[in-house]
A protein has these predicted regions:
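Generic structural signal for well-ordered alpha-helices
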Residues: 52-56, 93
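Catalytic His-Asp segment of secreted/periplasmic serine-dependent ester chemistry enzymes
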Residues: 73-153
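Surface-exposed amphipathic alpha-helices with a cationic face
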Residues: 56-63
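Short, flexible active-site loop motifs that bind/organize anionic cofactors or intermediates
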Residues: 38, 58, 129
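Short secondary-structure boundary/capping segments
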Residues: 12-13, 60, 97
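Proline-centered flexible-loop/turn and helix-kink motifs
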Residues: 16, 64-65
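Conserved SGNH/GDSL esterase-like catalytic core that processes O-acyl groups on lipids
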Residues: 1-53
Length: 153
């Protein structure tokens, strides 16, 4: 199915008349570690950094008149454990922010403003019991933060 494709390969399948495109990704890239994290100079989808460039440039080219917004991953309980490529989740967050800044794409930094940090025991218990996926209450918090932040953009 087309939605099984990597994010970078989905651009061709998106609605050509979209007014706003919001991309929320990075945590599965970290967790699965399928591609090396790469360097900022990478421009092909073989690395996470290159895939960010490839995706952002592709969206800008397809949607020059639309608003594009990227969202950083949320914190996760295992964020201080390196992935299979030896990288921490925060490195993926920083790549998204740096690459979006390069393209002048706004970033909704959920890493910094979501209020969901499962490394804090009470937050994990109430909003993110598995340490990764927000529960219904966690999604309510996310929705409120996302709505407030999107209104600022």
């Amino acid at each position: 199915a087309e939605w099984d494709l990597d994010f970078v390969l989905r651009v061709d399948h998106l609605d050509p008349d979209a007014d706003i495109i919001v991309v929320f990704g990075g945590t599965n890239d970290f967790g699965h570690g399928d591609a090396p994290i790469g360097n900022f100079s990478d421009r092909t989808p073989e690395t996470f950094s290159g895939a960010c460039h490839y995706l952002m440039a592709g969206l800008i080219n397809k949607y020059p008149d639309s608003r594009i917004v990227f969202m950083t991953p949320l914190h996760r309980a295992s964020e201080n454990t390196p992935n299979a490529n030896g990288a921490l989740l925060e490195a993926y967050v920083e790549i998204i922010k740096k690459t979006a800044s390069y393209y002048s794409i706004p970033v909704l930094d959920l890493w910094s403003v979501s209020g969901i940090q499962p490394c804090v025991p009470i937050i994990k218990e109430k909003f993110c019991p598995d340490g990764l996926h927000p529960n219904d209450k966690g999604h309510e918090i996310m929705a409120q933060v996302i709505a407030e932040e999107l209104l600022k953009i």
